[in-house]
């Protein structure tokens, strides 16, 4: 084998035909140019992060004329039993890596409209919240929900909710003039309920305890409510400060059987006294003759 048949960056034991180096270089130059034509700033950042990750794992990077680094996997010698067969496996590794990058970039470009405003680091920690962002409208141009998650807590925060723009006008907080609300039908408590329940105010201090400061000069009247006076004679305060020197006698409280025996004795005495005014009952036949109940009609 001539020295030109050995590749400069390949490890020992890896031999490729001389045409593979030029062919691989041309393919790598064509593929990134085709991809870079439609790349945005987010996709370029993503490809740079992927290349850094592959370089940290021990892969080599080939620099294209457009200034972008395309990562390429390299074979690692694990022992004498593992060897890379001659042919084009290295070229297929280049093509597979490039195809994976194209697939990832196309996927990120499709979801770019709904996920561009959110940080990329939080996707692994909160997968449920990011799944809500994939809900698109029928046209697929704008997200159906406006969603601003709070990553510091478990609360899902919706800024506006569902999109409510009709012909460029937000109608989410508009009310119809024909709408009959509860306030219009029944009123509100603070306007329709009287705290005094219709009782007129008599004195400056005569006001409800909930709003004492609303009456002018309420503190000048002394007490909040004047003493109640139901008579013409002016009220005189009586001092009830008598302290007895001996215990007061207990109020007699007789049991029930004693009271019942006294009542029965009183009834017997009253019945005996009524015997002095006793009169015999009127005969029944006499009562019938007087009433005319025994007069039969005569037969002719």
From Swiss-Prot:
Keyword Phosphoprotein belongs to the record: yes
Pfam families membership: SASRP1
Residues annotated with Phosphoserine modification: 113
Location of the region described as Disordered in the Swiss-Prot/TrEMBL record: 1-42, 64-91
Signal peptide: none
Listed Polar residues bias regions: 1-10
InterPro entries: SASRP1
Comp. bias (Basic and acidic residues): 27-42
PANTHER family: SPERMATOGENESIS-ASSOCIATED SERINE-RICH PROTEIN 1
Name of the protein described by the UniProt record: Spermatogenesis-associated serine-rich protein 1
Protein species of origin: Homo sapiens
Gene from which the chain derives: SPATS1
């Amino acid at each position: 084998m001539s020295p030109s048949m050995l590749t400069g960056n390949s490890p020992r034991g890896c031999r490729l035909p001389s045409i593979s180096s030029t062919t691989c270089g041309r393919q790598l130059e064509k593929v990134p140019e085709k991809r870079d034509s439609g790349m945005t700033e987010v996709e370029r950042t993503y490809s740079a992060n992927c290349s850094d990750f592959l370089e940290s794992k021990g892969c080599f990077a080939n620099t294209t004329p457009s200034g972008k680094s395309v990562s390429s996997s390299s074979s690692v010698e694990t022992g004498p039993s593992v060897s890379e067969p001659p042919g084009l496996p290295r070229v297929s590794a280049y093509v597979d890596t490039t195809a994976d990058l194209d697939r990832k970039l196309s996927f990120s470009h499709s979801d770019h409209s709904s996920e561009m405003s959110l940080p990329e680091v939080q996707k692994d920690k909160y997968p449920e919240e990011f799944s809500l962002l994939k809900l698109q409208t029928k046209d697929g141009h704008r997200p159906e929900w406006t969603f601003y998650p709070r990553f510091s807590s478990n609360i899902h925060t919706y800024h506006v909710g569902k999109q409510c723009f009709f012909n460029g006008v937000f109608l989410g907080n508009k009310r119809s003039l024909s709408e009959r609300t509860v306030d219009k039908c029944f009123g509100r408590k603070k306007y329709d309920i009287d705290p005094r329940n219709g009782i007129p105010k008599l004195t400056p201090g005569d006001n409800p305890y909930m709003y004492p400061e609303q009456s002018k000069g309420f503190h000048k009247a002394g007490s909040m409510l004047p003493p109640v006076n139901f008579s013409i004679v002016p009220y005189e305060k009586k001092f009830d400060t008598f302290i007895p020197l001996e215990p007061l006698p207990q109020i007699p409280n007789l049991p029930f059987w004693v009271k019942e025996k006294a009542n029965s004795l009183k009834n017997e005495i009253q019945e005996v006294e009524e015997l002095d005014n006793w009169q015999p009952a009127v005969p029944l036949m006499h009562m019938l003759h007087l009433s005319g109940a025994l007069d039969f009609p005569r037969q002719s």
